[in-house]
Amino acid sequence: MFLQGLVLLSFVYVSTSTTSYSTSTSSCNKYKLNQNRCLENKDTETGEQCAYLSCNEWPEYACEPMYGCEIATYASSICQKNPSYTCHYSSNLASNPFVYTEEALLDQVTDLPGLKDALSYNQFSGYISLPGTQKNIHYWLVEAEQDADLKPLVFWTNGGPGCSGLIGFLTEQGPFRPTADGEIQMNPYAWNKVANMVFLEQPVGVGFSYSNVEDDYKIGDDQAAKDNLATILGLIEKFPHFNHSDIYITSESYGGHYMPTLANEIINYNDAQEYNAEKLNFKGFAVGNPYTDYYSGVGAEMETYWGKQLLPKPLWDKYVANGCTTIEQQLNNSVCSTLILNFMRKIGNLNPYALDYPVCLSQQQMTMRNYLKAELLEKGESGLLSADSFDIPYEPCEDEYSSTYLNRADVKAALHVHTDIEWEECSRTTKYELKDKMLPMEKYYKILLNSKTHPEMRILVYSGDDDSVCGTIGTQRWIYDLGFPLLEDWTTWYVDGQTAGYISKFKTPYSKDSRFTFMTVHGAGHEVPTYKPKEALDLFEKYLTNAI
């Protein structure tokens, strides 16, 4: 797809009109340009771009083998010998073996307001313009703290639907936390300790992402998957040194729809490519507390309340006797709806997304709550739950530090985003298809895990067990109903000698090892890294290194 050159210096990149090469001061060695495979600057086996130069043309510089073609490497003085090459320097870059395109350097974040300490890694923020559209998706890339060239490339997006990936950046697993005084506090459990992280604001209309076409803000699962794939491809085009990196996608909440549909889109894209070099090196996805199946997932919310002993036994017995444990009965049986209303009154003012934590719903939680509630409210005229049934005084608690910080003019300038866009955690501009919430995602898991062409792809579903809405009971239900045989059932995993949760592994075709894992995180709410940051980082690293 894109040529990845051999890199020996960290602060220089050399570009032509078509590609970029790395620099070296070593003398010419024994390698010769393979004329049999490299015809018309194309590798006949892989289709990759070949070097323009050979040792014969520039005998004082080395030629190195790369993917079957010999890549010419040369020192920056070549720019003086051949004016068709241009050298670009950035003294702000942290040391690493990457070579950056001019477009990438324009997005480099060199002076982040409130950040006092020098970073050992680079960060970039800007837009990926989607081909053939007027859609512009905002990304924020933070490289791995150490050995970035050896670490995978991981994309993160939040749920909602319609909530910003910068929620994850600033309140969950990103490297920074804005404070009340406008400073930046470092997160000791940031996920870029083990990966190059890209935080996306998608779909279009979310956060700083925008389009000049009003209809683009009407979107559903299928189009979101296509746009997210285009965003990944666009980012790798801007940062071609990631072309051969292992790629993972991650999310939570409505990511239970985003992740399997995007993974399926990537698989289809890869299968359509003629050359292996054009394929994404896709390794799988991880999703936390996923909204996967409206019926098996949401229907388990009341069971979680009972399991937490938040309900009296006589009321629960009546609920079971009337068959109310299925979502179908909850939606269509007036007795069940009345019992649910009684449950909510008995429970009182608790946060359903983090039952053992103070009452404080984030915007992402509120968005999911309203999205799921819509189905019940539509039944109001039939005698089921109506709008006034949800008069429990939940208080939204948008992270005001994040909103205040991101809406500062100097921060917007540092991030290279449109200054006239008012950043919100969850979009009021994006019009997401309500019908998509009823679509079960299990079929995608079966397609992906039965894929012959991608046996290396691994899926991790993790669940904070203090969440009732996208909780562990419902998640277990749909996972076990997939029918994959167990390899390992409910074993304990530990952090600092303490029980962090439980692991179940499933046998899938075309692999002797487990490609499908379920993990619980004990005591974590809906956004696992917010409530259990150390455990979340441990889980994430185990997944990336296949150490679960």
Across the structure, where does each feature detected by a protein language model lie?
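Intrinsically disordered, low-complexity serine/threonine-rich segments
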Residues: 5, 13-14, 18-29, 49, ...
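Intrinsically disordered, low-complexity regions enriched in serine, threonine, proline
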Residues: 27-29, 34, 103-105
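Terminal and linker regions of secretory-pathway proteins
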Residues: 2-5, 11-23, 87-548
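Extracellular Cys-Trp
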Residues: 30-33, 37-58, 62-74, 78-90
